[in-house]
Design a protein with these regions (language model features):
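Hydrophobic h-region of N-terminal signal peptides that target proteins for export
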Residues: 9-18
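Bacterial N-terminal signal peptides that target proteins for export
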Residues: 1-7
Length: 250
């Protein structure tokens, strides 16, 4: 992907200079764990000398884009991804530092705990993972932007996409609490609990707009640099596992 990006970006700085500096947006698609490839793409764009005026993302693209928009460099993002305890983050386990040794040993026997309701025998909160640990991480990483803010006033103007399960509509975040917007955009249905916000039930934006070029254009972009890491469509016979169906949503 790096070489394809270089081929596409090689002459763009000259085009921008000749055109009187039009606005450039980077659009980052959803794509599950493959979304970390967005970090490498941003590094290539920077190395090519392309100015970035807007960042728009969905799902994992919203996470990378949101952090990049407030000043994280690709190198910092890469280090952050590699330094995380993903088993802990992708669970509702308490922080090991706050757990007694006996309880910690019991919890480490299981990769994933599923909270069932004894009354209804259903998975609680419409998702296996409530996402508290991820939400806490996002809040920490966005320190200084924890109040409701206008995303157009971030160091790089930003927007991300979610879906309102109440009516199936697309929700584009242009303002609000940045960590909440990022968490809403990657709430994979059936995996992460949705985010309740202002009467909406928000989940991963991948089904309504997984590659939000239109959002970037509406923000004022003249040129779009799109980074699409979506998986190719699977045949019906290939959708055999629940994880296949879940990941196809992003």
């Amino acid at each position: 992907m790096k070489y394809r990006l270089w081929a596409c970006l090689l002459f763009l700085p000259m085009v921008l200079w000749a055109s009187g500096r039009p606005k450039v947006a980077v659009v980052l698609s959803g794509g599950g764990a493959k979304g970390t490839a967005h970090i490498g793409a941003l590094k290539v764009i920077e190395e090519a000398g392309i100015p970035i005026d807007y960042v728009v993302g969905t799902s994992m693209g919203a996470i990378v884009g949101g952090l990049y928009s407030i000043g994280y460099t690709p190198q910092q993002l890469d280090s952050m991804v590699n330094a995380q305890n993903w088993k802990f983050l992708l669970s509702d386990a308490p922080n090991p530092k706050d757990v007694l040794l006996d309880d910690r040993l019991k919890s480490e026997r299981y990769v994933l705990s599923i909270p069932f309701s004894l009354k209804s025998a259903a998975v609680s909160d419409a998702g296996i993972i409530k996402g508290k640990n991820l939400a806490r991480l996002f809040s920490t990483l966005t320190e200084g932007y924890q109040d409701s803010v206008d995303f157009s006033r971030l160091p790089i103007p930003f927007a991300c996409v979610s879906e309102n399960l109440v009516n199936g509509s697309e929700v584009v975040f242009h303002e609000g609490i940045l960590a909440t917007a990022m968490r809403s955009s990657m709430s994979i249905p059936g995996v992460f609990a949705p985010v309740d916000l202002d009467g909406m039930v928000l989940v991963d934006g991948g089904m309504v707009n997984n590659y939000p070029v239109d959002v970037a254009l509406a923000m004022g972009a003249d040129y779009i640099i799109g980074v699409d890491v979506q998986s190719p469509l699977l045949k019906a016979s290939e959708l055999k596992l629940a994880k296949d169906i879940c990941w196809k949503r992003i």
